[in-house]
Amino acid sequence: MILNISVSLLIFLAFYGFSSDAKSLPCSEVKKEYGIVCRCNATYCDTIEPLGTVTSGKAVVYTTSRNGKRMNRSELKHTTSSTAKTKVYVNTTQSFQPVMGFGAAFTDAAGINMKMLPQTMQDQIIQQYFSDDGLGYVFGRVPMASTDFSTHEYSYDDVKFDFDLKNFNLTVEDLQYKIPFIKKAMTASGGKLKLFATPWSSPGWMKTSGRMVGAGELLGDQNGKYYQTWAQYFVKFFEAYHAQGIDFWSLTPQNEPTTGIDPLWKWQTLFFDASMERNFIKKLLGPALASSPVTKNLKIMINDDQRINLPHWPNVILTDPTAAQYVHGIAIHWYEDFIDPATVLTETHEKFPDYFLLATEACAGYFPADGPKLGSWSRAEQYANDLIKDMGNWVGGWVDWNYILDLQGGPNLAKNFVDSTIIVNATAQEYYKQPIWHVMAQFSKFVKPGAIRVGINIIEKSVDVEGLSFLNQDGTKTVVLLNKNEVLSFDVAISDVSAPNVIYDLTIQPNSLITIVYK
Protein backbone atom coordinates (compact mmCIF):
# COMPACT_ATOMS: atom_id res chain seq x y z
CA MET A 1 0.00 0.00 0.00
CA ILE A 2 2.84 2.41 0.85
CA LEU A 3 4.46 1.72 -2.53
CA ASN A 4 1.20 2.39 -4.37
CA ILE A 5 0.72 5.67 -2.56
CA SER A 6 4.27 6.71 -3.40
CA VAL A 7 3.86 5.91 -7.07
CA SER A 8 0.56 7.77 -7.25
CA LEU A 9 2.09 10.75 -5.50
CA LEU A 10 5.02 10.76 -7.92
CA ILE A 11 2.70 10.76 -10.92
CA PHE A 12 0.57 13.52 -9.42
CA LEU A 13 3.56 15.71 -8.67
CA ALA A 14 5.15 15.03 -12.03
CA PHE A 15 2.19 16.02 -14.14
CA TYR A 16 -0.21 18.10 -12.06
CA GLY A 17 1.48 19.48 -8.98
CA PHE A 18 4.18 21.91 -10.05
CA SER A 19 4.74 25.14 -8.19
CA SER A 20 7.04 27.86 -9.43
CA ASP A 21 9.74 26.52 -7.09
CA ALA A 22 9.44 22.87 -8.13
CA LYS A 23 12.36 21.00 -9.61
CA SER A 24 12.10 18.85 -12.69
CA LEU A 25 12.30 15.10 -13.09
CA PRO A 26 15.31 14.44 -15.35
CA CYS A 27 15.25 12.53 -18.60
CA SER A 28 15.45 8.76 -18.14
CA GLU A 29 18.05 8.40 -20.88
CA VAL A 30 18.09 5.44 -23.22
CA LYS A 31 20.68 5.28 -25.98
CA LYS A 32 19.12 4.16 -29.23
CA GLU A 33 20.55 3.69 -32.72
CA TYR A 34 20.43 7.38 -33.63
CA GLY A 35 20.91 9.01 -30.23
CA ILE A 36 19.27 9.57 -26.87
CA VAL A 37 15.56 9.32 -26.09
CA CYS A 38 13.77 9.94 -22.80
CA ARG A 39 11.92 6.83 -21.64
CA CYS A 40 8.56 7.17 -19.89
CA ASN A 41 6.31 4.56 -18.30
CA ALA A 42 3.40 4.37 -15.88
CA THR A 43 5.49 5.51 -12.91
CA TYR A 44 8.01 7.96 -14.36
CA CYS A 45 8.46 10.57 -17.05
CA ASP A 46 10.78 13.54 -17.29
CA THR A 47 9.34 16.99 -16.76
CA ILE A 48 10.41 20.56 -17.45
CA GLU A 49 11.78 22.64 -14.62
CA PRO A 50 9.53 25.70 -14.29
CA LEU A 51 10.75 29.06 -15.47
CA GLY A 52 10.14 30.71 -12.11
CA THR A 53 10.15 34.46 -11.60
CA VAL A 54 12.29 36.34 -14.08
CA THR A 55 13.70 39.49 -12.48
CA SER A 56 15.52 42.40 -14.03
CA GLY A 57 19.20 41.69 -14.59
CA LYS A 58 18.76 37.92 -14.60
CA ALA A 59 18.22 35.54 -17.51
CA VAL A 60 16.98 31.96 -17.47
CA VAL A 61 18.47 29.63 -20.08
CA TYR A 62 17.16 26.26 -21.30
CA THR A 63 19.31 23.96 -23.43
CA THR A 64 18.55 20.91 -25.58
CA SER A 65 21.42 19.28 -27.45
CA ARG A 66 22.68 16.29 -29.38
CA ASN A 67 24.82 15.23 -26.42
CA GLY A 68 21.79 14.60 -24.22
CA LYS A 69 20.74 17.86 -22.63
CA ARG A 70 16.96 18.02 -22.51
CA MET A 71 15.56 21.38 -21.46
CA ASN A 72 18.37 21.81 -18.91
CA ARG A 73 17.77 25.00 -16.92
CA SER A 74 20.44 27.46 -15.80
CA GLU A 75 20.60 31.13 -14.82
CA LEU A 76 22.74 34.07 -15.92
CA LYS A 77 23.47 37.44 -14.39
CA HIS A 78 24.05 40.35 -16.70
CA THR A 79 27.41 41.95 -17.35
CA THR A 80 28.26 45.37 -18.74
CA SER A 81 30.82 44.31 -21.35
CA SER A 82 31.68 41.25 -23.39
CA THR A 83 34.45 39.83 -25.56
CA ALA A 84 32.13 37.42 -27.37
CA LYS A 85 32.52 37.61 -31.14
CA THR A 86 28.88 36.86 -31.86
CA LYS A 87 26.60 39.71 -30.83
CA VAL A 88 22.83 39.32 -30.65
CA TYR A 89 20.87 42.57 -30.52
CA VAL A 90 17.17 42.45 -29.68
CA ASN A 91 15.07 45.37 -30.91
CA THR A 92 11.62 45.53 -29.33
CA THR A 93 10.75 48.69 -31.27
CA GLN A 94 10.70 46.59 -34.44
CA SER A 95 7.62 44.38 -34.27
CA PHE A 96 6.24 41.72 -36.59
CA GLN A 97 3.46 39.11 -36.25
CA PRO A 98 1.72 37.99 -33.07
CA VAL A 99 2.35 34.42 -32.02
CA MET A 100 -0.67 32.14 -32.39
CA GLY A 101 0.77 29.04 -30.72
CA PHE A 102 1.76 25.45 -31.37
CA GLY A 103 0.00 22.11 -31.63
CA ALA A 104 -0.43 18.67 -33.19
CA ALA A 105 -3.01 16.48 -34.92
CA PHE A 106 -5.57 14.07 -33.45
CA THR A 107 -5.24 11.29 -36.01
CA ASP A 108 -6.66 7.78 -35.86
CA ALA A 109 -3.12 6.44 -35.57
CA ALA A 110 -2.43 8.60 -32.53
CA GLY A 111 -5.62 7.44 -30.83
CA ILE A 112 -4.93 3.78 -31.64
CA ASN A 113 -1.50 4.05 -30.06
CA MET A 114 -2.87 5.83 -27.01
CA LYS A 115 -5.33 2.97 -26.52
CA MET A 116 -2.39 0.55 -26.38
CA LEU A 117 -1.29 2.18 -23.12
CA PRO A 118 -2.90 2.20 -19.65
CA GLN A 119 -5.04 5.14 -18.61
CA THR A 120 -2.32 6.68 -16.44
CA MET A 121 0.06 6.85 -19.40
CA GLN A 122 -2.62 8.24 -21.70
CA ASP A 123 -3.17 11.03 -19.19
CA GLN A 124 0.59 11.59 -18.89
CA ILE A 125 0.90 12.10 -22.63
CA ILE A 126 -2.01 14.53 -22.82
CA GLN A 127 -0.53 16.51 -19.93
CA GLN A 128 2.91 16.43 -21.55
CA TYR A 129 1.48 18.07 -24.65
CA PHE A 130 -1.38 20.33 -23.62
CA SER A 131 -0.90 21.45 -20.02
CA ASP A 132 1.04 24.51 -18.92
CA ASP A 133 3.51 22.15 -17.24
CA GLY A 134 4.07 20.41 -20.58
CA LEU A 135 4.41 21.91 -24.04
CA GLY A 136 1.39 24.15 -23.61
CA TYR A 137 -0.02 23.28 -27.04
CA VAL A 138 -3.06 25.34 -28.02
CA PHE A 139 -3.84 23.92 -31.47
CA GLY A 140 -5.37 20.59 -32.43
CA ARG A 141 -5.83 19.53 -36.04
CA VAL A 142 -8.70 17.09 -36.58
CA PRO A 143 -9.00 15.08 -39.81
CA MET A 144 -12.53 14.79 -41.16
CA ALA A 145 -12.86 10.99 -41.51
CA SER A 146 -9.96 8.83 -42.68
CA THR A 147 -6.41 9.70 -43.71
CA ASP A 148 -3.40 7.57 -44.53
CA PHE A 149 -2.92 7.42 -40.75
CA SER A 150 -6.04 5.26 -40.49
CA THR A 151 -6.36 1.50 -40.75
CA HIS A 152 -8.86 1.67 -43.62
CA GLU A 153 -10.59 4.22 -45.82
CA TYR A 154 -13.94 5.46 -44.56
CA SER A 155 -16.11 8.55 -44.74
CA TYR A 156 -19.09 9.72 -42.72
CA ASP A 157 -21.55 8.72 -45.43
CA ASP A 158 -20.59 5.83 -47.68
CA VAL A 159 -24.13 5.32 -48.98
CA LYS A 160 -24.12 6.05 -52.71
CA PHE A 161 -26.17 8.96 -54.01
CA ASP A 162 -27.19 10.08 -50.51
CA PHE A 163 -27.27 13.73 -51.55
CA ASP A 164 -29.33 14.65 -48.47
CA LEU A 165 -26.71 13.01 -46.22
CA LYS A 166 -29.40 11.12 -44.33
CA ASN A 167 -26.85 8.44 -43.46
CA PHE A 168 -24.20 10.85 -42.18
CA ASN A 169 -22.72 9.60 -38.91
CA LEU A 170 -19.51 9.90 -36.96
CA THR A 171 -17.60 6.63 -36.83
CA VAL A 172 -16.03 4.43 -34.19
CA GLU A 173 -12.73 6.15 -34.98
CA ASP A 174 -14.14 9.51 -33.90
CA LEU A 175 -15.81 8.09 -30.82
CA GLN A 176 -12.85 6.01 -29.64
CA TYR A 177 -9.66 7.54 -31.06
CA LYS A 178 -10.32 11.25 -31.47
CA ILE A 179 -13.08 12.66 -29.28
CA PRO A 180 -11.96 11.21 -25.91
CA PHE A 181 -8.45 12.60 -26.32
CA ILE A 182 -9.64 15.93 -27.70
CA LYS A 183 -11.78 16.34 -24.58
CA LYS A 184 -8.85 15.48 -22.32
CA ALA A 185 -6.70 17.99 -24.19
CA MET A 186 -9.38 20.65 -23.84
CA THR A 187 -9.32 20.13 -20.09
CA ALA A 188 -5.52 19.95 -19.84
CA SER A 189 -5.16 23.21 -21.78
CA GLY A 190 -7.53 25.03 -19.46
CA GLY A 191 -9.96 25.70 -22.28
CA LYS A 192 -7.33 27.28 -24.54
CA LEU A 193 -7.36 24.55 -27.21
CA LYS A 194 -8.27 25.74 -30.70
CA LEU A 195 -9.37 23.01 -33.08
CA PHE A 196 -9.33 23.10 -36.86
CA ALA A 197 -10.66 20.43 -39.20
CA THR A 198 -9.43 19.20 -42.56
CA PRO A 199 -10.78 16.57 -44.99
CA TRP A 200 -8.49 14.30 -46.99
CA SER A 201 -11.25 13.19 -49.36
CA SER A 202 -14.95 13.23 -49.96
CA PRO A 203 -16.79 9.90 -49.87
CA GLY A 204 -15.65 7.81 -52.82
CA TRP A 205 -19.04 7.89 -54.52
CA MET A 206 -18.69 11.67 -54.92
CA LYS A 207 -15.35 11.38 -56.77
CA THR A 208 -14.47 10.81 -60.39
CA SER A 209 -12.37 7.82 -59.33
CA GLY A 210 -15.06 6.21 -57.18
CA ARG A 211 -12.65 5.85 -54.24
CA MET A 212 -11.32 8.04 -51.45
CA VAL A 213 -7.81 6.66 -51.98
CA GLY A 214 -6.03 7.97 -55.05
CA ALA A 215 -6.39 10.88 -57.43
CA GLY A 216 -9.72 12.36 -58.40
CA GLU A 217 -12.02 15.34 -58.03
CA LEU A 218 -15.67 15.85 -57.24
CA LEU A 219 -18.09 14.69 -59.91
CA GLY A 220 -20.14 17.05 -62.01
CA ASP A 221 -20.35 20.80 -62.39
CA GLN A 222 -18.66 23.00 -59.78
CA ASN A 223 -22.06 24.31 -58.75
CA GLY A 224 -23.75 20.93 -59.10
CA LYS A 225 -25.23 18.53 -56.57
CA TYR A 226 -21.95 16.78 -55.70
CA TYR A 227 -20.29 20.06 -54.78
CA GLN A 228 -23.42 21.22 -52.94
CA THR A 229 -23.54 17.98 -50.96
CA TRP A 230 -19.85 18.26 -50.16
CA ALA A 231 -20.39 21.73 -48.68
CA GLN A 232 -23.23 20.43 -46.52
CA TYR A 233 -21.01 17.53 -45.42
CA PHE A 234 -18.78 20.08 -43.66
CA VAL A 235 -21.73 21.55 -41.78
CA LYS A 236 -22.87 18.06 -40.75
CA PHE A 237 -19.41 17.28 -39.42
CA PHE A 238 -19.21 20.37 -37.22
CA GLU A 239 -22.77 19.90 -35.97
CA ALA A 240 -22.00 16.26 -35.09
CA TYR A 241 -18.94 17.27 -33.07
CA HIS A 242 -20.91 20.09 -31.45
CA ALA A 243 -23.40 17.46 -30.27
CA GLN A 244 -20.43 15.71 -28.64
CA GLY A 245 -19.50 18.90 -26.77
CA ILE A 246 -16.68 19.95 -29.09
CA ASP A 247 -16.59 23.18 -31.08
CA PHE A 248 -14.03 24.28 -33.65
CA TRP A 249 -12.09 27.45 -34.33
CA SER A 250 -11.24 26.92 -38.02
CA LEU A 251 -11.10 24.62 -41.02
CA THR A 252 -9.40 24.17 -44.35
CA PRO A 253 -11.43 23.11 -47.40
CA GLN A 254 -8.95 20.38 -48.36
CA ASN A 255 -5.68 18.81 -47.26
CA GLU A 256 -2.97 19.19 -49.91
CA PRO A 257 -5.44 19.74 -52.76
CA THR A 258 -2.78 19.64 -55.48
CA THR A 259 -2.03 15.96 -54.74
CA GLY A 260 -5.45 15.04 -56.12
CA ILE A 261 -4.11 15.23 -59.68
CA ASP A 262 -1.26 12.76 -59.04
CA PRO A 263 -2.18 9.39 -60.64
CA LEU A 264 0.30 7.60 -58.35
CA TRP A 265 -1.01 9.03 -55.08
CA LYS A 266 -1.42 6.21 -52.56
CA TRP A 267 -3.85 7.55 -49.99
CA GLN A 268 -6.91 9.76 -49.64
CA THR A 269 -6.98 12.99 -51.61
CA LEU A 270 -9.31 15.24 -53.58
CA PHE A 271 -8.19 17.64 -56.28
CA PHE A 272 -8.81 21.36 -56.19
CA ASP A 273 -6.78 24.04 -57.91
CA ALA A 274 -6.84 27.60 -56.62
CA SER A 275 -9.74 28.74 -58.80
CA MET A 276 -11.79 25.67 -57.86
CA GLU A 277 -11.16 26.31 -54.16
CA ARG A 278 -12.10 29.98 -54.65
CA ASN A 279 -15.37 29.08 -56.34
CA PHE A 280 -16.20 26.40 -53.78
CA ILE A 281 -15.63 28.81 -50.89
CA LYS A 282 -17.52 31.76 -52.31
CA LYS A 283 -20.49 29.94 -53.85
CA LEU A 284 -21.04 26.92 -51.61
CA LEU A 285 -18.86 26.35 -48.55
CA GLY A 286 -18.82 29.92 -47.22
CA PRO A 287 -22.60 30.40 -47.49
CA ALA A 288 -23.25 26.90 -46.08
CA LEU A 289 -21.13 27.58 -43.01
CA ALA A 290 -22.71 31.01 -42.55
CA SER A 291 -26.18 29.44 -42.50
CA SER A 292 -25.65 27.36 -39.34
CA PRO A 293 -25.29 28.82 -35.83
CA VAL A 294 -22.69 26.13 -35.11
CA THR A 295 -20.44 27.04 -38.04
CA LYS A 296 -21.11 30.71 -38.77
CA ASN A 297 -18.01 31.95 -36.90
CA LEU A 298 -15.54 29.40 -38.23
CA LYS A 299 -12.38 30.77 -39.82
CA ILE A 300 -11.45 29.35 -43.22
CA MET A 301 -7.78 28.83 -44.04
CA ILE A 302 -6.86 28.34 -47.69
CA ASN A 303 -4.12 26.31 -49.39
CA ASP A 304 -3.22 23.80 -46.60
CA ASP A 305 -0.48 22.65 -48.95
CA GLN A 306 3.17 23.37 -49.75
CA ARG A 307 4.53 26.90 -49.85
CA ILE A 308 5.45 26.37 -53.50
CA ASN A 309 1.80 27.38 -54.07
CA LEU A 310 2.54 30.86 -52.72
CA PRO A 311 1.74 33.57 -53.53
CA HIS A 312 -0.30 32.17 -56.45
CA TRP A 313 -2.95 30.45 -54.33
CA PRO A 314 -3.93 33.50 -52.25
CA ASN A 315 -3.59 35.71 -55.34
CA VAL A 316 -6.40 33.75 -56.98
CA ILE A 317 -8.67 33.54 -53.93
CA LEU A 318 -8.09 36.69 -51.90
CA THR A 319 -8.36 39.10 -54.82
CA ASP A 320 -11.98 37.96 -55.18
CA PRO A 321 -13.91 40.03 -52.60
CA THR A 322 -16.76 37.54 -52.33
CA ALA A 323 -14.46 34.62 -51.60
CA ALA A 324 -12.13 36.70 -49.43
CA GLN A 325 -14.89 37.67 -47.00
CA TYR A 326 -15.00 34.06 -45.77
CA VAL A 327 -11.22 33.60 -45.45
CA HIS A 328 -9.05 34.44 -42.44
CA GLY A 329 -5.74 32.67 -42.99
CA ILE A 330 -3.30 30.80 -45.19
CA ALA A 331 -2.15 27.31 -44.17
CA ILE A 332 1.18 25.81 -45.22
CA HIS A 333 2.97 22.44 -45.02
CA TRP A 334 6.72 21.89 -44.85
CA TYR A 335 7.33 18.94 -47.18
CA GLU A 336 8.65 20.90 -50.16
CA ASP A 337 10.36 23.72 -48.28
CA PHE A 338 13.61 22.79 -50.03
CA ILE A 339 12.12 24.05 -53.32
CA ASP A 340 11.08 27.59 -52.40
CA PRO A 341 12.85 29.85 -49.86
CA ALA A 342 11.02 30.96 -46.72
CA THR A 343 11.03 34.52 -48.06
CA VAL A 344 8.00 33.58 -50.18
CA LEU A 345 6.09 33.67 -46.88
CA THR A 346 7.12 37.28 -46.32
CA GLU A 347 6.17 38.07 -49.91
CA THR A 348 2.74 36.55 -49.29
CA HIS A 349 2.29 38.46 -46.04
CA GLU A 350 3.21 41.74 -47.70
CA LYS A 351 0.59 41.17 -50.39
CA PHE A 352 -2.08 40.02 -47.92
CA PRO A 353 -1.21 41.48 -44.50
CA ASP A 354 -4.72 41.00 -43.09
CA TYR A 355 -4.53 37.20 -43.31
CA PHE A 356 -2.54 35.13 -40.84
CA LEU A 357 -0.07 32.43 -41.88
CA LEU A 358 -0.18 29.12 -39.99
CA ALA A 359 2.04 26.06 -40.52
CA THR A 360 -0.46 23.20 -40.25
CA GLU A 361 1.53 20.01 -40.90
CA ALA A 362 5.07 18.71 -40.58
CA CYS A 363 6.77 15.42 -39.76
CA ALA A 364 10.22 13.93 -40.14
CA GLY A 365 11.05 10.75 -42.01
CA TYR A 366 8.73 11.43 -44.94
CA PHE A 367 11.14 11.44 -47.89
CA PRO A 368 11.62 8.60 -48.19
CA ALA A 369 9.03 7.35 -45.70
CA ASP A 370 11.36 5.46 -43.39
CA GLY A 371 9.61 5.68 -40.03
CA PRO A 372 11.03 6.72 -36.67
CA LYS A 373 14.73 7.16 -35.98
CA LEU A 374 14.93 6.92 -32.23
CA GLY A 375 17.13 9.63 -30.76
CA SER A 376 17.79 11.41 -34.06
CA TRP A 377 19.24 14.89 -33.53
CA SER A 378 19.22 15.71 -37.24
CA ARG A 379 15.44 15.42 -37.26
CA ALA A 380 15.15 17.59 -34.17
CA GLU A 381 17.33 20.15 -35.92
CA GLN A 382 15.05 19.97 -38.96
CA TYR A 383 12.17 21.05 -36.74
CA ALA A 384 14.13 23.86 -35.08
CA ASN A 385 15.38 25.15 -38.42
CA ASP A 386 11.90 25.16 -39.94
CA LEU A 387 10.36 26.86 -36.92
CA ILE A 388 12.97 29.61 -37.12
CA LYS A 389 12.63 30.04 -40.89
CA ASP A 390 8.81 30.03 -40.84
CA MET A 391 8.31 32.27 -37.82
CA GLY A 392 11.05 34.56 -39.06
CA ASN A 393 8.90 35.11 -42.15
CA TRP A 394 5.52 36.00 -40.60
CA VAL A 395 4.16 32.54 -39.76
CA GLY A 396 2.19 32.91 -36.53
CA GLY A 397 2.09 29.31 -35.34
CA TRP A 398 3.32 25.82 -36.07
CA VAL A 399 1.34 22.57 -35.88
CA ASP A 400 2.99 19.15 -35.89
CA TRP A 401 1.45 16.03 -37.46
CA ASN A 402 0.70 12.87 -35.36
CA TYR A 403 1.33 13.45 -31.67
CA ILE A 404 2.20 9.78 -31.11
CA LEU A 405 3.06 6.82 -33.36
CA ASP A 406 4.34 3.27 -32.89
CA LEU A 407 7.84 1.94 -33.45
CA GLN A 408 7.09 1.41 -37.14
CA GLY A 409 5.73 4.93 -37.56
CA GLY A 410 2.10 3.97 -37.93
CA PRO A 411 -0.40 2.51 -38.25
CA ASN A 412 -0.74 3.78 -41.81
CA LEU A 413 -2.91 2.21 -44.50
CA ALA A 414 -0.51 3.28 -47.28
CA LYS A 415 2.63 2.21 -45.37
CA ASN A 416 3.62 5.88 -45.34
CA PHE A 417 5.48 5.42 -42.06
CA VAL A 418 7.02 8.56 -40.54
CA ASP A 419 8.43 9.88 -37.27
CA SER A 420 6.76 11.60 -34.34
CA THR A 421 7.66 13.56 -31.22
CA ILE A 422 6.58 10.59 -29.09
CA ILE A 423 6.99 6.94 -30.09
CA VAL A 424 5.16 4.22 -28.18
CA ASN A 425 6.56 0.76 -27.44
CA ALA A 426 3.32 -1.01 -26.54
CA THR A 427 5.03 -4.35 -25.85
CA ALA A 428 7.19 -2.79 -23.14
CA GLN A 429 4.36 -0.48 -22.02
CA GLU A 430 6.57 2.56 -22.37
CA TYR A 431 7.05 5.47 -24.73
CA TYR A 432 10.01 7.51 -25.90
CA LYS A 433 10.18 11.27 -26.11
CA GLN A 434 12.26 12.04 -29.15
CA PRO A 435 14.68 15.00 -29.22
CA ILE A 436 12.00 16.62 -31.41
CA TRP A 437 9.70 16.82 -28.37
CA HIS A 438 12.20 18.86 -26.40
CA VAL A 439 12.96 21.07 -29.40
CA MET A 440 9.26 21.89 -29.58
CA ALA A 441 9.39 22.69 -25.86
CA GLN A 442 12.21 25.19 -26.42
CA PHE A 443 9.70 27.24 -28.44
CA SER A 444 6.23 26.48 -27.08
CA LYS A 445 7.10 26.83 -23.38
CA PHE A 446 8.45 30.35 -23.67
CA VAL A 447 6.87 31.82 -26.79
CA LYS A 448 3.24 32.05 -25.76
CA PRO A 449 0.17 33.00 -27.78
CA GLY A 450 -0.04 36.77 -27.87
CA ALA A 451 3.72 37.28 -27.86
CA ILE A 452 5.08 39.49 -30.63
CA ARG A 453 8.07 38.60 -32.76
CA VAL A 454 10.53 41.46 -32.54
CA GLY A 455 13.71 42.45 -34.30
CA ILE A 456 16.90 40.46 -33.92
CA ASN A 457 20.28 41.25 -35.43
CA ILE A 458 23.12 38.72 -35.17
CA ILE A 459 26.49 40.39 -35.79
CA GLU A 460 29.66 38.52 -36.84
CA LYS A 461 27.62 35.38 -36.72
CA SER A 462 28.60 31.97 -37.97
CA VAL A 463 26.45 30.67 -40.79
CA ASP A 464 25.57 27.87 -38.35
CA VAL A 465 23.86 30.14 -35.80
CA GLU A 466 20.37 31.47 -36.37
CA GLY A 467 17.59 32.66 -34.12
CA LEU A 468 14.45 34.58 -33.28
CA SER A 469 13.35 36.99 -30.57
CA PHE A 470 9.94 37.68 -29.03
CA LEU A 471 8.33 40.08 -26.57
CA ASN A 472 5.88 38.27 -24.29
CA GLN A 473 2.75 39.82 -22.85
CA ASP A 474 4.23 39.73 -19.33
CA GLY A 475 7.13 41.92 -20.44
CA THR A 476 9.72 39.15 -20.63
CA LYS A 477 11.76 38.66 -23.78
CA THR A 478 12.56 35.30 -25.33
CA VAL A 479 15.50 34.61 -27.63
CA VAL A 480 15.86 31.21 -29.32
CA LEU A 481 19.24 30.36 -30.88
CA LEU A 482 20.20 27.26 -32.87
CA ASN A 483 23.80 26.14 -33.44
CA LYS A 484 23.91 23.70 -36.36
CA ASN A 485 27.68 23.27 -36.27
CA GLU A 486 28.66 19.72 -35.29
CA VAL A 487 32.04 20.69 -33.78
CA LEU A 488 32.26 24.36 -32.84
CA SER A 489 30.87 26.24 -29.86
CA PHE A 490 30.17 29.96 -30.11
CA ASP A 491 30.45 32.63 -27.43
CA VAL A 492 27.41 34.88 -27.67
CA ALA A 493 26.55 38.23 -26.11
CA ILE A 494 22.85 39.10 -25.99
CA SER A 495 21.58 42.60 -25.31
CA ASP A 496 18.75 44.97 -26.14
CA VAL A 497 19.34 47.80 -28.57
CA SER A 498 17.74 50.04 -25.94
CA ALA A 499 20.09 48.82 -23.16
CA PRO A 500 23.42 47.91 -24.79
CA ASN A 501 25.25 47.75 -21.45
CA VAL A 502 22.99 45.03 -20.03
CA ILE A 503 24.58 41.96 -21.60
CA TYR A 504 24.00 38.25 -21.15
CA ASP A 505 27.11 36.24 -22.00
CA LEU A 506 26.81 32.56 -22.80
CA THR A 507 28.28 29.79 -24.93
CA ILE A 508 26.12 27.81 -27.33
CA GLN A 509 27.48 24.30 -27.70
CA PRO A 510 27.66 22.31 -30.98
CA ASN A 511 24.36 20.88 -32.21
CA SER A 512 22.29 22.62 -29.59
CA LEU A 513 19.23 24.81 -29.21
CA ILE A 514 19.00 27.36 -26.43
CA THR A 515 16.18 29.56 -25.19
CA ILE A 516 16.97 32.66 -23.11
CA VAL A 517 14.23 34.44 -21.16
CA TYR A 518 14.99 37.78 -19.52
CA LYS A 519 13.36 41.03 -18.51
UniProtKB/Swiss-Prot annotation:
Broad enzyme group: hydrolase
Catalytically driven reaction(s): a beta-D-glucosylceramide + H2O = an N-acyl-sphingoid base + D-glucose; a beta-D-glucosyl-(1<->1')-N-acylsphing-4-enine + H2O = an N-acylsphing-4-enine + D-glucose; an N-acyl-1-beta-D-glucosyl-15-methylhexadecasphing-4-enine + H2O = an N-acyl-15-methylhexadecasphing-4-enine + D-glucose
Active-site positions on this chain: E256 (proton donor), E361 (nucleophile)
GO biological process assignments: glucosylceramide catabolic process
Keyword entries, A-Z: Hydrolase, Lipid metabolism, Signal, Sphingolipid metabolism
EC number: 3.2.1.45
Pfam families cross-referenced by the UniProt entry: Glyco_hydro_30, Glyco_hydro_30C
Signal peptide boundaries: 1-24
Pathway note: Lipid metabolism; sphingolipid metabolism
Molecular function terms from GO: glucosylceramidase activity
One annotated Gene Ontology cellular component of this protein: membrane
Cross-referenced InterPro entries: GH30_C, Glyco_hydro_30, Glyco_hydro_30_TIM-barrel, Glycoside_hydrolase_SF
Family: Belongs to the glycosyl hydrolase 30 family.
Function: Glucosylceramidase that catalyzes the hydrolysis of glucosylceramides into free ceramides and glucose. C.elegans contains specific sphingoid bases, which are unique or different in structure compared to the sphingoid bases found in other animals. Two examples of these distinctive compounds are: 15-methylhexadecasphinganine and 15-methylhexadecasphing-4-enine.
Protein name: Putative glucosylceramidase 4
Encoding gene (name): gba-4
